[in-house]
Amino acid sequence: MASQVSRRAFLQVAASGAIAGQLDSHFHPATALTQAKSAASDWSLNATIIEACSCTMFCPCYFSMVPSGHGHGSMVDHYCRFNMGYRVNHGNFKGVKLDGVTFWIAGDLGADFSKGAEWAEITFEPSVTKEQRGALTTIIPHVYPVTWKAFTVGQDAPIEWTATNDRAVARLNGGKAAEVVLRRNPGMTSEPVVIKNLRYFGAPRNTGFILMPNEVEAYRVGPKPFEYKGTNGFMITYDISSKDIKT
C-alpha cells in the first residue's frame, strides 16, 4: 500500500466484505473508522494466544517500541516477525457468540513501530461465520492500536491449537502455512515461569505471560515468509470488553 492504514480501519473494511482477498489501497480509512466506532456497542472477549516472534527472550516490544536487533555492527536490523495462534474462550458481540473461534495473525512490527508497523495478515478458520468475523474485526483493533503499512486477509485455513503445562502447539493449514511450537521455560519448580502485572498491548486485563521459548515459529506463505528457532514465545489469556473502551 502506498499509504499507511490503521489496523482499525483495515479490520472494519474486512468486516464489510473485503475478507475474500488482499486489501485494495483505495478505500477510505476515515469512513471505516467512523463505522468501527458506531459498531462498538456491548461486547466482550476472553482469548488465549499461543504467540512467538523473532525477538530474543523476553520480547522487548512490551517495554519499548523498538524490537530486538539482528546482525552485527552497522548491519543490525530491528524487527519483530510474529505469529499469534488465537483461541476465543468466551465472547460475544451484539448477541453473536464467539466461544471456541480460532484465527491467526502474523506479521512484522518493523524497526520502530511508533512510526508504523510493517505488515500483518489475519487468517480465519473456514468454520468462522460472517457474523463472527464481523464481530472479531471490530473488537481486535482495540487490542492492537497499531498503524500498519500493509494489512491483508489470508485464505481461510484449518487451525490446530493445543496446549499443556509443558508444551503448546499451533499450526495453520497443518503447518504448511504457519507453525508455532513452544516449550515451557525451566524454572525453580515444575510450574511455568509467569510475568505478572505487565500490560498486553491494549488489553486491560491478563492472567500473565507464561514464558515458553519457541522450538520453531514460522510463516510459510505470501511474499515475506520467515522461520526462527529458539526465540521468544509465550502464552497469554487476556480479557477486554466494550466497557473498557473510552468513547
Predicted regions, residues:
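C-terminal segment of N-terminal export signals and the immediately downstream linker at the start
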Residues: 24-46
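Beta-strand-enriched cores of mature, soluble protein domains
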Residues: 41-247
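N-terminal secretory signal peptides and thylakoid transit peptides that target proteins
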Residues: 2-18
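Short N-terminal micro-motifs specific to bacterial/archaeal maturation
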Residues: 1-2, 46
